[in-house]
Design a protein with these regions (language model features):
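Detector for methionine-enriched segments
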Residues: 1, 79-80, 94, 155
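Conserved beta-sheet core of the metallophosphoesterase superfamily
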Residues: 49, 88-151, 155
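N-terminal active-site segment of His-dependent metallophosphoesterases
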Residues: 1-48, 56-66, 71-79, 138-141, ...
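Short, solvent-exposed aromatic-acidic interface loops
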Residues: 154-167
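Active-site environment of divalent metal-dependent phosphoester hydrolases
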Residues: 11-15, 33-38, 55-60, 84-89, ...
Length: 168
């Protein structure tokens, strides 16, 4: 299965990101969609599993939970918005990682792309950075990878300039 991972769209889902994700089978969104229209636009584009972020309202929280625990082709994925990274996990994230023991932990919030293997919990921590234009980040980013028979492979990063003016 071909997986796309994005976060922190903050009402912005443009052609650069769509082109990067055009061949994926599933989009995972690690929170801060920005509004329900953006969540629906992504869901109309590709099958979507998401979690709500700290900037998402009740309309998004009605459809996207605080955490997602998924099994995709033998890989257990735990996803939440505010998570941190190895050695600096949020307290709730550490509790959930310890309880669920995922192969992949996905989070967003920081707007900083990080892919780090956690030797303590034996899991890959992925933060795809921010796909939107709101925030302090300098570039917009997304990640995609394949999962086949319990193995992750061919991980790629998409990176685009941060736009000041929203495209329609």
């Amino acid at each position: 299965m071909f997986i796309g991972v994005i976060s922190d769209t903050h009402k912005y889902f443009n052609e650069n990101v769509k082109n990067f994700l055009k061949d994926v089978d599933l989009v995972l969104h690690a929170g801060d969609f920005g509004n329900i229209e953006t969540a629906n636009k992504i869901a109309d584009f590709k099958p979507l599993k998401g979690v709500y972020g700290n900037c998402d309202g009740t309309d998004i929280r009605e459809y996207h939970p605080y955490i997602q625990v998924l099994d995709i082709e033998g890989i257990k994925i735990l996803m939440m918005h505010i998570g941190g990274y190895p050695g600096r996990y949020d307290y709730r994230a550490m509790q959930l990682i310890n309880a669920h023991r995922p192969d992949i932990f996905i989070c967003g919030h920081s707007h900083i792309l990080k892919v780090i293997y956690d030797n303590k919990f034996n899991c890959l921590t992925i933060n795809p950075g921010a796909a939107g234009i709101e925030g302090f980040h300098v570039v917009r980013t997304a990640i995609r990878f394949h999962i086949d028979e319990g193995k992750i492979h061919d991980m790629e990063i998409g990176e685009w300039p941060k736009k000041v003016i929203k495209e329609e």
